[in-house]
């Protein structure tokens, strides 16, 4: 694990020195803090027998969705330097796996091997040479780390909100635009058995209440049906609360 972390640290220090914004002491301090942070993070997530396991956890990534890598930012804070002074590309991905470290500039470019190891006996000079050769080759191919759509180095890391607030548009429901409001329904009271029914005579029921639409100017008031007075047919008279048809009583 120490060789792979050393390759990552050499990779970052090479990019920082190329940006030429920090002094040598600040770069060395950043490299020391980054080494400590990565060792602490990877010690329980390192699987030489299965290098792909935990790959996402060990990945160092910067893109338009994550403009600052948390581990690199923590190393900057611990070494008292600004993240923007590193001069990192806006789109950068590093996969730190057992025996191999790979990198990709830009989200649409191909990945390349930063350094690969067959054993743990390699010294720092050999690791530094591997990283330098890989960087020299890739910078000529990818134009010094330019991304697929952005500039090659990040100028700012603070995400600033837009100064123009969007004016909220009125919200309408489809039901309000298509269907008019329905009238409130008042059910008729339940009648006792036998009401409106005579003994041995024709059964009469109360007339239906005509349906009407409510006044559109009174949307919030309950709708009350218009009362209708029932007029009996000609020839019928009431006898003790019963309507009697004299034709039915006539002998046949």
Curated annotation (Swiss-Prot):
Database matches in SMART domains: btg1
Region listing for Disordered, in residue ranges: 138-163
Disulfide bonds: none
Entry GO terms, CC: cytoplasm
Tissue: Ubiquitous.
Cross-referenced Pfam families: BTG (PF07742)
Superkingdom of the organism of origin: Eukaryota
Alphabetized InterPro entries for the sequence: Anti_prolifrtn, BTG, BTG-like_sf
Function: Overexpression impairs serum-induced cell cycle progression from the G0/G1 to S phase.
Family: Belongs to the BTG family.
Protein name: Protein BTG3
Name of the gene this protein is made from: Btg3
